[in-house]
Amino acid sequence: MTNMETTYAAKDFFEKTIKSENLESRYEKLYINTNVRSNYLFNSSIEGIEKSDLIILIGTNPRFEATILNSRIRKNYLKNKIEIISLGDVGDLTYPYQVISNNTDTIKDIIDNKHEISEKIKKSKYPSIIFGQSVLKLKSAPYILSLIHISEPTRPS
């Protein structure tokens, strides 16, 4: 297992050195716009997740998809009692989390400040929003990611 930035660097290396674009390591086609670096980079770092004061999980079960990340989330929860919110019920993550609706409209409502957790995100100093692979499988993935990028400039610094 490797992070997306390393995978992308390897892909770029092979394309430039041996002129090969015949690379595929995913079992399913996922929407990943590699023109936007933040689409494939885990910005906070795995260690950085321990600084988060609010974590929102979208389309992911880190207990099975990213066990090291999940252990860092758990460590942060146990130490700081942070709030963790998941769009959809993903089962036992080994720490408590609030479940909210699992649909694209919910994401839009959060960004448009029409959802109850919008205010929590605004008040948070170090929020982390973690997208999982299941979001990238959706036909609406480009739309969902565009919503996030549209909202970035309005995020207070």
Describe the residue ranges of each PLM region.
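Single conserved hydrophobic/aromatic residue that forms the stacking wall/gate
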Residues: 148-157
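Glycine-rich, acidic loop regions that bind phosphate or pyrophosphate groups
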Residues: 9-16, 20-128, 134-136
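Conserved short loop/turn motifs at secondary-structure junctions
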Residues: 1-3, 132-137
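Amphipathic alpha-helical
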Residues: 5-7
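Charged, low-complexity surface patches
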Residues: 3, 62, 140
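Glycine- and acidic-residue-enriched helix-capping/strand-helix junction motifs
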Residues: 138-145
